[in-house]
């Protein structure tokens, strides 16, 4: 009776294991990405719930930026983002308590707040950058300049001006409010520049890297939160006129899309 294993048999077994691993690895990676994408979607749902809670209490949405400070503008302007204002309405009262709203967002008294991560604002698919904290992967939609170059403050979140739900005349269901904006230059949840105009398609490879645009690390699309609170994964192939229509709050456009 032969009790040993020949070298050939061992190599065959190793080869089979390698083939199985190669076949299973993509499936495992895909399953992990699906879980991360689901978490990203849940993050935006929490943001949507916070916006509705904010509106229920104050009868208005937050402004996109409170006391907007233009580039090289007066340093006394506070420049706080909508994403800082809604913190108490998404169970982040402790982080909200770190913010001194009597001083500008980048005042030394707000250093700790600026360095504090808020888990809901971080998409798990986006690689963490060592030394970067207080970031957000979601930006408010200031408007679109896909179909127009004038009056581009046609979105839900603009400088200094808060809107009520009734001001979103295209309907809450049909108006995007917040979208993934990974890797943008103004990606801090406290920074009032966390709003942007969309000028191209989703994950547009032609978009300048230093522009804030709808971008994600997901395959083939990005998560978008609509004003009603629902979230959609919108494909890179979304038509530009459709994307423009879903961003405007009062454009009176008709559009349909397969999510």
Give a label for each model feature.
Residues 2-36, 46:
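N-terminal single-pass transmembrane signal-anchor helix
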């Amino acid at each position: 009776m032969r009790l040993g294993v020949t070298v050939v048999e061992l190599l065959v077994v190793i080869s089979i294991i390698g083939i199985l691993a190669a076949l299973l690895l993509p499936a495992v990676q895909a399953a992990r990405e699906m879980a991360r994408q689901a978490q990203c979607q849940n993050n935006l749902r929490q943001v949507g719930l916070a916006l509705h809670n904010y509106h229920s209490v104050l009868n208005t949405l937050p402004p996109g930026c409170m006391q907007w400070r233009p580039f090289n503008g007066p340093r006394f302007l506070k420049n706080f983002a909508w994403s800082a204002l809604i913190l108490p309405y998404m169970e982040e009262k402790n982080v909200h308590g770190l913010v001194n709203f009597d001083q500008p967002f980048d005042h030394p008294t707000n250093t700790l707040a600026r360095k504090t991560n808020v888990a809901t604002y971080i998409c798990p698919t986006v690689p963490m950058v060592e030394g970067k904290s207080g970031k957000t992967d979601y930006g408010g939609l200031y408007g679109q300049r896909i179909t127009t170059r004038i009056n581009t403050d046609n979105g839900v979140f603009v400088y200094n001006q808060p809107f009520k739900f009734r001001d979103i005349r295209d309907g809450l269901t049909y108006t995007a409010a917040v979208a993934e904006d990974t890797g943008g230059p103004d990606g801090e949840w406290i920074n009032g520049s966390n709003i942007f105009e969309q000028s191209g398609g989703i994950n547009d490879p032609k978009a300048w890297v230093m522009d804030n645009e709808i971008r994600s690390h997901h395959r083939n699309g990005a998560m978008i939160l609509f004003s009603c609170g629902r979230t959609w994964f919108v494909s890179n192939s979304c038509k530009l006129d459709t994307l423009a229509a879903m961003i405007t709050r009062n454009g009176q456009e008709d559009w349909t899309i397969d999510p």
